[in-house]
Amino acid sequence: PAKLPAEIANKNGINTINKFFDINVKNFIEKKYGKFDFITSHNVLAHIENNLEVFKGTYELLNDKGYFCFEVGYFVKVIKNNYFDTIYHEHLDYHHAKPLVSFLKKIGFSVLFITQNKIQGGSLRILCRKQRNIKISKQVNKFLFNENKLMINYSKKIMFWERKINENLNNLKRYIKQKKMDGRIVAGYGAPTKA
């Protein structure tokens, strides 16, 4: 929650509830506004401790054949592209498509489409529908198949990734040390992009 932006939004006619989404907020929204045809969420789920409660609440807020489109960080891209700097202390989790599809199915969603984009180093965008037993599309099956191929030797990739991070750190240390030895003045400034 962010009090000032919520106040500004409400003053400008954008109905904003300045609370974390939970069952109480879900009940309040449903009582005040009813159910929805479409709900969207973009790169906020990594900050949520209880994803099950949020996804169930979202499911319950949708009309019988409503849609939910959400975006989450894609851990495959984080590893593949060495984007260790996209990992922040506020992020509680990172995702792969296959376990998300299984998780969504248990709640009652059918996944219609999965795509990747370059947002935040690589994100998954998933479109699902509040309707059980919709046949999984060729596109979703192909995405899951390709992800599965990438996951072969996953533990080796994680270990390689750790070595790559340490290599980057050591290269930076050597560079700074060399500049100091050359008589250069070295200054550092750190500012996380999302904290």
Which ranges hold each PLM region?
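A conserved beta-strand element that flanks and buttresses the S-adenosyl-L-methionine
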Residues: 37-40
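Glycine-rich adenosine-cofactor-binding loop
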Residues: 179-195
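Flexible, glycine-/basic-rich loop-and-beta segments that form/coincide
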Residues: 120-166
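A short glycine-rich, Lys/Arg-flanked "PGG" loop and its adjoining helix->strand segment in the class I
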Residues: 52-69
